[in-house]
């Protein structure tokens, strides 16, 4: 049974959960099953972690506390389907640290089966989550019926609370610390290695601090302070809000001991996942006892203290409140050496901790608590991880997001010592290597501008990571600790790419990860920080490109912080305005909307931009997943990267958003993501069946294709193409296949499909040309009269469609759907244009062209004389030419077995993407790309079940994920003799009057181009 607690003082000390396995000691009498040997036992209100009481155990040397009852230990699932393990969970309070340990022993009928030691050299609360079968000595047995706690060879007193004899928990997350350093010893998860990394030693020598270095330390401290704090005033309203929030925690002192409402990290609730019905992972947050709000209040108090007048009553009040909260949270176990049993993803919970302590550095010094506070910050920021020289480029995006601020705060908290200098040198080196292009699917930044998390390009995580990266690049800029030019330029390129694929600020739907809600955006402040960090080579005080990009982006960022998703960094509008003013005063002006073409090999993404519109294609492959689904996140977005093409647009002069582009969540048919060729399923069948498939992953679904060919080519950064072999995973409709291509030529996008097939006889297969929300009167009036016939269609947003194949128009007023996160029913008015391939199609195909930002007259003329002609459209290749643009675009799915149509390009020796542009009678621009990232070669690394079906496996289990992209030679044969300036990636194999043979060395899914001259 769960006893819920609500956000009011009367309930904040209620016992969290009652269960026969849980001991919280809230009854006045000792439980009958608990006895002691050479011990005094009692119920105490002096210290408590759950409810208002704990068990007080005063022991003589080698005394024992015994609990006799069925411990409810369960063995791990022998079938391997359930990966959870039985864990013992306990909180211990110690008033007097002892360099000793107590021993927990688990017995069956008096015979010891398993045990573990717990160090007691601490003051305050500490926790242990210890898995019986993995972490303990001995062999646990079902039916164990006694817990014995054995004291060390010394007197002492401990308080015990929130003891759970056994409960099944996710076995990945238990955390070692100073008390239980042996727990989960094999983990390399970066959230869980606090203890291991606390032992790391520096490889940079200690040196005296020079005068210049001392000045730089002051500069760093000032820059950091300005970054996290903007001077303001403390209003009476703000002071009153702080008082009310502070009073909720009921912090009091008695006999020199602090007490108050128990505080937990959000993940502590995972102890109850298998104990209570309707378990809610966020229950502790809802109960008001989670530490994120606590640290946010500490930061708020620190800001109020800094904003108030010296010697004023409110300043003294804020100081008292801050110190009381500091004492209480330290007592609660937020201290050096403590990991609360389960600490995964704690970065978000302690985000406010670091700036709060840093802003009160002087107060903590005055109170003699600075050293303790420093150590606390260094422990949770895992600052010692920066000591060894990085072995390779890149770090996890979460480290940038949640650890950079903590690490630099923990270092800048220190006095100006040689140790501080050593930390600063180590830290700047760590940031430098972290910002460099990472190999394979490793985090965080890619050579092409991709920003990686969860082994894919993931803007929603990148905005948090870029917050850390850009802040640190600025912090160290123009000092002896500045990052390298490569690191600086890599992050700059990531931001330039992001402002290209976002329009104006919003992520494309297909690039929204598990948040396809239209709310994710880039953060203009990142561009501001890079603008004032100067040029990558360190020569310029400002970066012109970043300044111009920032001034364009910030002008339209009128969204309120309240509307922003939780993962978006919080930004001060005052700071935005201040930097914008500074840049304008220095002569910088906003850039125009970016134009051209971008291909992200590490995102399976192609983007074409003209005027204010963008077209974003996304696919997936054997390297890059199609969609990320969690329980309660992205339930229906299976087809997001099945060759989708989203047009983001707005009337001239308006800011482009999902809404101006005809998208909203209400009523959106998740089957009909524009551009996608998919089986149109009932939403119950489309809903992700989220599983925990292996020990490398949690409850999540990220499905892969077994095809390596998926990605784009970009020619001269102005035009391009995109192709993919679509093969759906066997988890759902594994017989579904298609060959899809997009050809981006100036303001025209030609969309081709062939070889569409599956054996699903229950539901039709469709290619969606558009699906648009109809949200206002003008749009309703527009569609009343229909907006197309035959081959020509115009939507109400100014986009034209040329469709030379039979298509079906649907007007669904209303159309019913479901929310991506809750599954709750929604409705809206929508129009769709689709190509129906029928049920279980064989050799299906389609052809259409899109012209955004056009008019009916132009479209009518286009239909009479299309600006392109298709030369080949089959399983082997999609090839077209645009005579007016003098471009021929090749998507070669298979190695050509005969001469290719189109003139210049005769053969290639492998599948690839090619674009040829005739620049003059004697000059040609040739671009070649191999979309296969080649992280491994040969057949796809699938595992098959007994029926020969591809099994679902997590990306994290694959051994090749951190491999460098391999080089793939692509040999092209051109008609006639051509002169080529050789490059490291392009060599002439042979040439004569009849033909010229070139060999390109392709990697990273990148585009390589050369100029050919007669």
From Swiss-Prot:
Q: Which PANTHER family match?
A: CHONDROITIN SULFATE ABC EXOLYASE, PTHR37322
Q: Which SUPFAM superfamilies match?
A: Chondroitin AC/alginate lyase, Galactose mutarotase-like, Galactose-binding domain-like, Hyaluronate lyase-like, C-terminal domain
Annotated Ca(2+) binding lies at: 24, 26, 50, 53, 161
Q: Which BP terms from GO are recorded? A: carbohydrate metabolic process; chondroitin sulfate proteoglycan catabolic process
Which branch of life, at top level? Bacteria
The identity of this protein, by name, is Chondroitin sulfate ABC exolyase
Reaction catalysed by this chain? Exolytic removal of Delta(4)-unsaturated disaccharide residues from the non-reducing ends of both polymeric chondroitin/dermatan sulfates and their oligosaccharide fragments
The main location is periplasm
Q: Where is this site: Important for catalytic activity against dermatan sulfate substrate?
A: 344
Entry note: cofactor:
Divalent metal cation. Requires divalent metal cation for binding of dermatan sulfate substrate, whereas it is not necessary for the binding of chondroitin sulfate substrates. Prefers Ca(2+) or Mg(2+), binding 1 ion per subunit.
Q: Which GO terms describe its cellular component?
A: extracellular region; periplasmic space
Which residue positions hold the site described Important for catalytic activity against all substrates? 172, 628
Which EC number(s) does the record attach to this protein?
4.2.2.21
The family line of this record is: Belongs to the polysaccharide lyase 8 family.
**Key words, A-Z:** Calcium, Carbohydrate metabolism, Lyase, Metal-binding, Periplasm, Signal
- Active-site residues per Swiss-Prot or TrEMBL entry: 345 (proton acceptor), 454 (proton acceptor), 461 (proton donor)
Answer yes or no on keyword RNA-binding. no
**Localization in the cell:** Periplasm
């Amino acid at each position: 049974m769960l006893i819920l607690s609500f956000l009011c003082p009367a309930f904040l000390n209620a016992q969290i959960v009652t269960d026969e396995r849980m001991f919280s000691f809230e009854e006045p009498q000792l439980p009958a099953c608990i006895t002691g040997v050479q011990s005094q036992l009692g119920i105490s209100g002096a210290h408590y972690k759950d409810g208002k009481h704990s068990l007080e155990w005063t022991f003589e040397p080698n005394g024992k506390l015994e609990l006799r009852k069925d411990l409810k230990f369960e063995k791990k699932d022998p079938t391997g389907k359930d990966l959870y393990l039985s864990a013992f969970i306990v909180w211990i309070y110690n008033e007097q640290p002892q360099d000793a340990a107590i021993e927990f022993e688990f017995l069956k009928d008096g015979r010891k089966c398993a045990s573990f030691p717990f160090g007691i050299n601490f003051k305050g609360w500490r926790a242990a989550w210890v898995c019986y079968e993995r972490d303990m000595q001995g062999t646990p047995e079902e039916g164990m019926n006694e817990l014995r706690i054995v004291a060390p060879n010394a007197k002492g007193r401990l308080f015990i609370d929130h003891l759970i004899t056994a409960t099944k928990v996710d076995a990945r997350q238990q955390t070692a610390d100073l008390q239980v350093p042996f727990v989960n010893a094999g983990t390399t998860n970066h959230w869980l290695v606090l203890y291991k990394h606390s032992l790391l030693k520096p490889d940079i020598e200690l040196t005296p601090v020079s005068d210049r270095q001392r000045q730089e330390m002051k500069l760093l401290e000032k820059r950091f302070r300005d970054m996290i704090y903007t001077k303001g005033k403390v209003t009476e309203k703000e002071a009153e809000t702080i008082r009310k929030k502070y009073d909720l925690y009921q912090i009091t002192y008695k006999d020199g001991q602090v007490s108050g409402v128990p505080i937990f990290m959000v993940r502590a609730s995972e102890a109850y996942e298998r104990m209570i019905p309707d378990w809610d992972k966020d229950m502790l947050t809802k109960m008001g006892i989670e530490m994120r709000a606590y640290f946010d209040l500490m930061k708020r108090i620190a800001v109020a203290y800094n904003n108030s007048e010296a010697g004023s009553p409110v300043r003294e009040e804020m100081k008292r409140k801050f110190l009381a909260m500091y004492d209480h949270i330290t007592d609660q176990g937020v201290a050096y050496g403590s990991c609360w049993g389960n600490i995964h993803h704690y970065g978000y919970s302690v985000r406010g901790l670091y700036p709060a302590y840093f802003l009160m550095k002087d107060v903590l010094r005055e109170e003699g608590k600075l050293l303790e506070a420093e150590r606390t910050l260094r422990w949770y920021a895992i600052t010692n991880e920066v000591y060894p020289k990085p072995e390779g480029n890149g770090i996890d995006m979460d480290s940038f997001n949640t650890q950079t601020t903590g690490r630099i705060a923990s270092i800048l908290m220190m006095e100006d010592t040689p140790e501080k200098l050593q930390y600063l040198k180590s830290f700047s080196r760590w940031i430098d290597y972290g910002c460099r292009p990472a190999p394979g699917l490793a985090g965080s930044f890619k050579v092409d501008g991709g920003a990686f998390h969860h082994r894919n390009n993931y803007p929603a995580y990148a905005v948090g990571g870029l917050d850390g990266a850009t802040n640190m690049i600025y912090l160290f800029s123009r000092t002896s600790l500045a990052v390298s030019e490569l690191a600086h330029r890599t992050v700059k390129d990531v931001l330039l790419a992001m402002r290209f694929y976002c329009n104006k600020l919003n992520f494309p739907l297909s690039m929204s990860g598990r948040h396809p809600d239209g709310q994710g955006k880039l953060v203009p402040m990142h561009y501001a920080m890079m603008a004032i960090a100067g040029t990558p080579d360190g020569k310029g005080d400002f970066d012109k490109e970043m300044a111009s990009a920032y001034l364009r982006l910030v002008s339209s960022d009128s969204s309120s912080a309240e509307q922003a998703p939780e993962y978006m960094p919080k930004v001060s509008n005052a700071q935005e305005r201040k930097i914008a003013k500074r840049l304008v005063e220095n002569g910088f002006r906003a850039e125009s909307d970016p134009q051209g073409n971008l291909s992200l090999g590490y995102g399976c993404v192609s983007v074409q931009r003209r005027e204010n519109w963008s077209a974003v294609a996304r696919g997936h492959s054997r390297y890059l997943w199609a969609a990320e689904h969690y329980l309660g996140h992205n339930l229906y977005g299976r087809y997001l990267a099945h060759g989708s093409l989203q047009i983001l647009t707005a009337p001239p002069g308006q800011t482009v958003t999902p809404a101006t582009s005809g998208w909203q969540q209400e009523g959106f048919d998740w089957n009909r993501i524009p551009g996608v060729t998919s089986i149109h399923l009932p939403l119950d069948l489309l809903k992700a069946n989220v599983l925990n498939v292996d020990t490398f992953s949690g409850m999540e679904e990220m499905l892969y294709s077994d095809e390596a060919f998926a990605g784009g080519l970009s020619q001269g950064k102005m035009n391009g193409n995109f192709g993919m072999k679509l093969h759906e995973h066997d988890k759902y409709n594994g017989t579904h296949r298609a060959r899809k291509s997009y050809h981006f030529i100036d303001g025209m996008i030609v969309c081709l499909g062939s070889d569409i097939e599956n054996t699903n006889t229950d539901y039709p297969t469709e290619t969606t040309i558009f699906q648009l929300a109809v949200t206002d009167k003008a749009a309703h009036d527009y569609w009343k009269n229909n907006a197309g016939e035959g081959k020509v269609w115009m939507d109400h947003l100014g986009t034209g469609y040329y469709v030379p194949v039979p298509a079906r128009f649907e007007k669904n007023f209303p159309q019913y759907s479901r929310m991506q996160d809750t599954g709750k029913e929604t409705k809206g008015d929508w129009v769709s244009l689709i190509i129906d391939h029928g049920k279980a199609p064989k050799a299906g195909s389609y052809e259409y062209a899109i012209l955004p930002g056009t008019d009916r007259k132009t479209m009518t003329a286009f239909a009479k004389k299309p600006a392109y002609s298709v030369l080949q459209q089959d399983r082997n290749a999609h090839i077209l030419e645009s005579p007016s643009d003098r471009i021929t675009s090749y998507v070669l799915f298979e190695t050509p077995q005969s001469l290719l149509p189109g003139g210049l390009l005769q053969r290639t020796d492998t599948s690839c993407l090619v674009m040829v542009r005739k620049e003059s009678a004697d000059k040609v621009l040739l671009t070649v790309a191999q979309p296969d990232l080649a992280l491994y070669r040969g057949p796809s690394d699938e595992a098959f079940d007994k029926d020969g079906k591809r099994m679902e496996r997590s990306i994290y289990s694959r051994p090749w994920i951190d491999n460098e992209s391999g080089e793939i030679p692509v040999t092209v044969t051109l008609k006639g003799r051509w002169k080529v300036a050789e490059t490291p990636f392009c060599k002439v194999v042979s040439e004569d009057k009849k033909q010229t043979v070139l060999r390109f060395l392709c990697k990273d899914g990148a585009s390589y181009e050369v100029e050919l001259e007669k």
